[in-house]
Every structure is written in structure tokens, then in C-alpha cells.
Curated annotation (Swiss-Prot):
PANTHER family: COP9 SIGNALOSOME COMPLEX SUBUNIT 7, COP9 SIGNALOSOME COMPLEX SUBUNIT 7/DENDRITIC CELL PROTEIN GA17. This is COP9 signalosome complex subunit 7a. It is found in: Cytoplasm; Nucleus. It comes from Neurospora crassa (strain ATCC 24698 / 74-OR23-1A / CBS 708.71 / DSM 1257 / FGSC 987). Residues 263-290, 367-379 have a biased composition (Gly residues). Residues 240-417 are annotated as: Disordered. The lineage of its organism: Eukaryota, Fungi, Dikarya, Ascomycota, Pezizomycotina. The gene is csn-7a. Component of the COP9 signalosome (CSN) complex that acts as an regulator of the ubiquitin (Ubl) conjugation pathway by mediating the deneddylation of the cullin subunit of SCF-type E3 ubiquitin-protein ligase complexes. The CSN complex is involved in the regulation of the circadian clock through its control of the stability of the SCF(FWD1) complex.
Amino acid sequence: MEQTKALNALEPFIVLSKSATSPRAAADLVTRVTSAPNTFIFTELLQTPQIQSLEYSHEFSSYLTLLQIFSHGTYADYIANASALPALNDDQKLKLRQLSLLTLVANDGSNVPLDYDAMQRENNQAQPPNQSYASLTRRLELSSARELEELVISAIYAGLIEGQLDPANEMVQINSVAALRDVPARGVNGLLSSLQGWAGRCQATLQELEATMANLRDEADRRATEEQEWNNKMSQLLEDEQKGAVPSSSSSSLPFSWFNNTRGGGGGGDGAGAGGSFRGSGYSRGGGLSQGYRSSQRGSHQQHQNQSRQQQNHHHHHQSNQSGTNSLLTSGGGSYLSFREGPSAVSPSAAAGLMGSSTSFAALGGMETGSGSGSGPLGKRGSSDMDDSEEDIDDDTMDLDDEGDETKRGSKRKLTA
């Protein structure tokens, strides 16, 4: 913004330079432009042919040197060549001292023209160093601290610097400086170096950002691939589980096999499920105590089936008990061992009432074991076969009764005859 104001203030003098056809007119233009307020840059005016022609004028060539000092020199440069230069009015002295203050604080107090080291320090986020009253008063050819304070205040209002005065410590605290000094020819190389360094830092920053973005994209792709593989595995596992699931609605549809080894006697047992337990014992006509244990993967469902079968077995025991016992399985005595896997407990050997000891194996889905002597609970086949046996006994009894009646009637006929 300050540069725009300075360029706008210089523009009228550039237009006037076109009409300054004589060295005197050009020299007068130099005096006016260096005395005008808000004109702090003069390069464009220096490059005009009319101003450059002053170099060949023996009488007015000093005005060209004076304009060059205002462009990129200091007040000390003017004092060093004051005898060969035109005298300065009060406005010119104030302006040259303001520009010199800008150069001094920007260049760390060294009495050299501004070469845009301030730009480099701004890029490095460094503040110009503070200046003492004594140093600035001496370099700017001022007579008192009061004059220095007035100069600093005018430079702050002109937008050349930002800072504060510290009268107690006699220090000028500089916060920032404006780029309102022209670049001399000898300062171009330094400016190019600063710009190249700034461009290099920008390029390095861009490369780091691109590398970081590439790493983030690779990481995102890797995570997406892992997630897709995981989803595929889970889908395949679910599909395999559905295809390989065993239906449990009906036990008759499952594979079923028996292996029996009978060595006399009969046996039985009871059951214990995952959801609870049931234990019982009974005596048959052959004598003996049966006790068994059952484990099942079906929990309370198996327990319910065991209790139902136990009730059925007690019912059949009551019907077929002929010796005062409360359960009937097989006739005879011996030992019985049964291993069974499946949702139901059916022991063919116990149901059939085989003589001797019996060992049975069944493979289906759960597991049942039983051991003991004497009798245990009947399965469906046992109860069915026992009912058939009872019916046969009843038929035989009825046949004997019929034969007895027939014998009585025959004897009675003989006596009558």
C-alpha cells in the first residue's frame, strides 16, 4: 500500500520530465521531486532520458548525483560530498533523513545503501534490531534527542517504519520497515540471491508436502485393501458356515448307527444335561442297581427329553413290576455299559431285555454314558417290546383258561353220560 502511494506521488513528475528539454528544467524537476511529500522512490524518474542527460551537463550534473542519493543513499553520503552537491532545503533534509533512517534500521545500523536484507529478515521472521538514540543522532547529523524523536515520529506517520520510542532507555524499538528504497545497481545481485533462496525454500516445502500427500494416499490405499480382504474373508466364512450347517429339526434325518456286544445280563442308566441333571436307580427281577451319567450339547432341551423318557419308563415299570420293585428293564442280572451320541437316549440292549451283559454304542449328535447292574430306564423300543411280551402272556393266559374250561365241560359230559 505504501509503495502504491509513493508511485502515485511520483507519477506527475514523470509526466513533467517529458517537457524538461533543457538541463536547467531537469535540475529544477529534481529539486521539486525531492522536496515533495510522499515521494520516496525515484528509479523511474532516474531512468528517463531527460534526467540522464544531466550527466553530460557540467553545470547541473550534481543534480543527477543528488537524485541518486535520494534514491538509494543516506544523509552521510550527502555530507561526505556536500561541497560538490546543491544545498538542501528543510523539506529535502527531512526527507533524506527519513530515508536514511529507513536504511539504517533495515541494514542493522550499517551505513550502507539498502540492499533488501530487510526482505530476507522478514522471510526469516526476524525483527530489525533496536537502535540507540546516540547512534542514530550521530549518523543522521542531528543535534539532540528531541530532533531524533521528531524524526522517528514523522517516519512512523509516513509509513516508513513501525516502532516505539523508549525515552527512559534512550532506545528506538523497530518492529518493521517498509520497502520504500530503490535498489541500487550493486544491490541487484543480493536481491537475486534473496529471491533464489526464497524460491528454493518454497520448492523444498512443496516437495515435502507432495511426499506427505503421497504417503497418505499409499496408507489410505493399504487400509482400503486390508478392509476389502477382511470383508471378503468374513463373507467367505459366512457362506461356508451356511453351506456346512447341519439341520437339527429332526433326528431321524441324521446318520444313525449301532454296535452291540451282549454278554449276558441287562443294565441301564440315567442322564445329566448341560442345563440341569437327573439321576435315578431301579431294581429289576434279576436284581442290581443302575446308575449312569449323561452329557449333551443340547442343554435344557436334552434334560426335558430325559425327564420325559424317565416318566415313560416309570410308567412301564409300574405295569410290568411283578416282584415289588419300582422299575423293570430286563430279566436276569449282570452289568451294562452304554455309550450313545444323539439327541435321544435309546438303548436297544436294555429295550430288548437281552440276557447277559450288554455294551452299546450309538453315534448321532450328543453323548450318553451309563453303567451299572440290574436294570435302568427303558427306551421306546424297550417299552414297545415289553408291551408285546405282556400281550403274549395275556394271550397265553387266556388260552390256558379256555383249555381249562373245555376240560371241565368234557368231564361234566362224561359224568352226565
